[in-house]
């Protein structure tokens, strides 16, 4: 006999839905690489994450596919955290402080098919492109007005997201499915990949809210340094 109380998978997307439902107007502040301060909220984050989820599906991204980011802490990167994992794909966050040779190795080893990058990494991406056979789409995390100097094959993030209406329901699947992928700095040998699941990320998020954790609540304002 199995219990039926709260018998649902621990999905990352459900955390965003909780925030949208109960804290829709709570402010989220970030700064873009274009030096613009962006003030958003959980309602807008949810809508744009769903638009990006639709964008990824339109690109042909499927569950289990790796989607890489080479980016700083911005509102667009946050949207990707939820959008990529939300459709069952794996967000592959690449450490921009690694050597170019290590970044090349990591992207190829993970076989990431899409690369989202901040405009500060345009020249790095251009130099690496010939050595990245698995990457089929390059997305500059900016708008059309800031595409000067971007690699020729790059597409502006905002143009892609604007093509979708955000009318999307997050799928429910195995909570043990991979949600994100990080690589070590390669202290010995090449960097090693570490896979996180929806379940592990969900439980970690709950733990930081506990009294013996960071004791965070909806009453707190936090500055995240990732």
Briefly describe each language-model feature range.
Residues 67, 88, 187:
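Conserved G/P- and acidic residue-centered "switch" motifs that form tight phosphate/ATP-binding loops
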Residues 77-85, 91, 201, 208:
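Short hydrophobic alpha-helical segments of the AMP-binding
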Residues 15-17, 58-59, 86-162, 173:
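Structural core segment of the AMP-binding/adenylate-forming
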Residues 56-61, 167-177, 181-225:
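Conserved adenylate-forming
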Residues 28-74, 78-82, 99-104, 156-159:
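Conserved AMP-binding/adenylate-forming core of the ANL superfamily
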Residues 7-29, 47:
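A short N-terminal helical cap/helix-turn-helix that marks the beginning
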Residues 71-74, 95, 216, 222-226:
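Conserved AMP-binding
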Residues 39-40, 98, 155, 173, ...:
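A broad, structural micro-motif
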């Amino acid at each position: 006999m199995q219990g039926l109380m709260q018998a649902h998978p621990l999905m990352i997307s459900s955390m965003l839905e909780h925030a949208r439902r109960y804290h829709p107007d709570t402010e989220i502040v970030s700064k873009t690489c274009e030096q613009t301060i962006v003030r958003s909220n959980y309602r807008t984050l949810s809508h744009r994450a769903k638009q990006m989820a639709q964008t990824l599906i339109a690109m042909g991204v499927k569950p289990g596919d790796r989607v890489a980011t080479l980016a700083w802490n911005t509102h667009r990167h946050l949207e990707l955290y939820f959008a990529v994992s939300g459709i069952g794909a794996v967000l592959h966050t690449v450490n921009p402080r690694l050597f170019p040779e290590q970044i090349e190795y990591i992207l190829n080893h993970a076989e990431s098919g899409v690369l989202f990058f901040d405009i500060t990494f345009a020249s790095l991406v251009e130099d690496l492109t010939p050595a990245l056979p698995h990457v089929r789409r390059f997305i500059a995390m900016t708008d059309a007005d800031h595409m000067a100097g971007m690699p020729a094959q790059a597409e502006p993030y905002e143009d892609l997201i604007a093509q979708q209406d955000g009318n999307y329901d997050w799928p429910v699947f195995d909570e043990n499915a991979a949600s994100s992928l990080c690589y070590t700095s390669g202290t010995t040998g090449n960097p090693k990949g570490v896979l996180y699941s929806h379940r592990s990320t969900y439980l970690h998020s709950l733990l930081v809210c506990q009294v013996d954790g960071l004791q965070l609540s909806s009453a707190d304002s936090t500055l995240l340094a990732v």
